[in-house]
A protein has these predicted regions:
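Class I S-adenosyl-L-methionine
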Residues: 1-81
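Beta-strand/loop-alpha-helix module characteristic of Rossmann-like adenine-cofactor folds
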Residues: 2-5, 9-13, 18, 50, ...
Length: 155
């Protein structure tokens, strides 16, 4: 079972495996989360094991914990192999330090949009701090972020 953020060329390394796309993109879901959870259980019982392939780190807004808990509740043994989160990799690739002595003592990683499709309250808190702020899944809210930051600076 693989997500939308997985580079499909990786699937060639498992050419004998059944590949099921369960990806999600804003407003467009191949499967709802409950269906993905059920597929994990069904395929594990039917095939003896299942691989849940996700892009980045499944424990950073990736529902990895939810899926592992669901599998464990159904008696499945799980193993986790962490990926590299874009929250860390992208700033590094652009030579942007997440922390830097004298300017940023911490960093926040925040979802841009909540389950209810609202701006996260944590964004408002982060805008008031001196921390580096990384917002994931936030392109549709980028004007709201900029307006919020401008209001904070004006105070």
């Amino acid at each position: 079972l693989y997500d939308a953020l997985v580079n499909e060329s990786i699937l060639e390394f498992a050419n004998r495996a059944e590949h099921i796309f369960v990806g999600k993109r804003k407003g467009c879901y191949a499967y709802q989360q409950e269906q993905i959870n059920d597929l994990i259980i069904q395929r594990a019982y039917k095939k003896g094991h299942v691989v849940r392939l996700k892009g980045g780190d499944p424990f950073v807004f990736g529902r990895g914990a939810e899926e592992m808990e669901y599998a464990a509740a159904h008696g499945l043994e799980t193993a986790f192999v962490p990926g590299i989160s874009s929250a860390l990799a992208v700033p590094g690739h652009q030579n942007i330090p997440l922390t830097k002595r004298g300017s940023s003592e911490s960093f926040w990683v925040i979802t841009g949009t909540t389950k209810e499709h609202q701006l996260s309250n944590d964004v408002k808190l982060a805008a008031k701090s001196t921390a580096t702020v990384v917002i994931l899944m936030g392109m549709s809210k980028h004007l709201a972020f900029l307006n919020l930051k401008a209001k904070v600076k004006a105070r």
